Amino acid sequence: MELGNQPGQGNRPEIELEWYQYLQNTVGEALSNYGWYILLGCIVIYFLIQKLSANFTRAVASTRTTVTDPDEIVRRQEAVAAARMRMQVELNAQAELYKQKQVQLQEEKRRRNIETWDRMQEGKSSKVGCRLVQDASPRTSTSSSAPKPKPESRPLRDSGYNPLTGGGGGTCAWRPGRRGPSSGGSUG
């Protein structure tokens, strides 16, 4: 018996050789077609792993220091409480100023209403702004309780005014619009 010609062992090297050639052809073809994409993907994955591992170690280190240091936790809580107290004091001061302004505005409004009522009782204009104009001019009349009659004025429009007919005078009169396109061009 020969060692190299046994019936079960003779086919094995040929099958391994065919498998090796098949694998080499398949991998070689994939690398020749997609080699640059594979290389670029590996580089991107490498940098992502580096970035994520750095972030992960930083996060783990920060959680260790915050959890293990109770004095720091107490100091932070006290600082937060002090900041809240300071903001609350400021808010209370602003609310107090707002209330004072509202009271002043209400008092001013009440005073104006009283002045308007008094002026209406005297027969004067109810407008407060008119009072400033009247106070600026010296009063010649001794009887201020009797209002002066208004002078006769002509009507603003004629009694037969109709804007559709254009008979009211003036330079502008209504005219119906033209039919057709508003801008030039052929309508062909």
UniProtKB/Swiss-Prot annotation:
Chain intervals for the UniProt region annotation (Disordered): 116-188
Low complexity composition bias: residue spans: 136-147
Subcellular localization(s) per the UniProt record: Endoplasmic reticulum membrane; Cytoplasm
Entry's Gene Ontology BP terms: endoplasmic reticulum unfolded protein response; retrograde protein transport, ER to cytosol
The keyword Transport belongs to this UniProt entry's keyword annotation: no
Protein origin, superkingdom: Eukaryota
Keyword list, A-Z: Cytoplasm, Endoplasmic reticulum, Membrane, Selenocysteine, Transmembrane, Transmembrane helix
Pfam families: Selenoprotein_S
Spans through the membrane: 29-49
Coiled-coil residue windows: none
Biased composition (Basic and acidic residues): 116-125
Entry's Gene Ontology cellular component terms: Derlin-1 retrotranslocation complex; Derlin-1-VIMP complex
Membrane topology classification: Single-pass membrane protein
Similarity section: Belongs to the selenoprotein S family.
Described purpose of this protein according to its UniProt entry: Involved in the degradation process of misfolded endoplasmic reticulum (ER) luminal proteins. Participates in the transfer of misfolded proteins from the ER to the cytosol, where they are destroyed by the proteasome in a ubiquitin-dependent manner.
Protein name in the entry: Selenoprotein S B
Organism: Xenopus laevis (African clawed frog)
Taxonomic placement: Eukaryota, Metazoa, Chordata, Craniata, Vertebrata
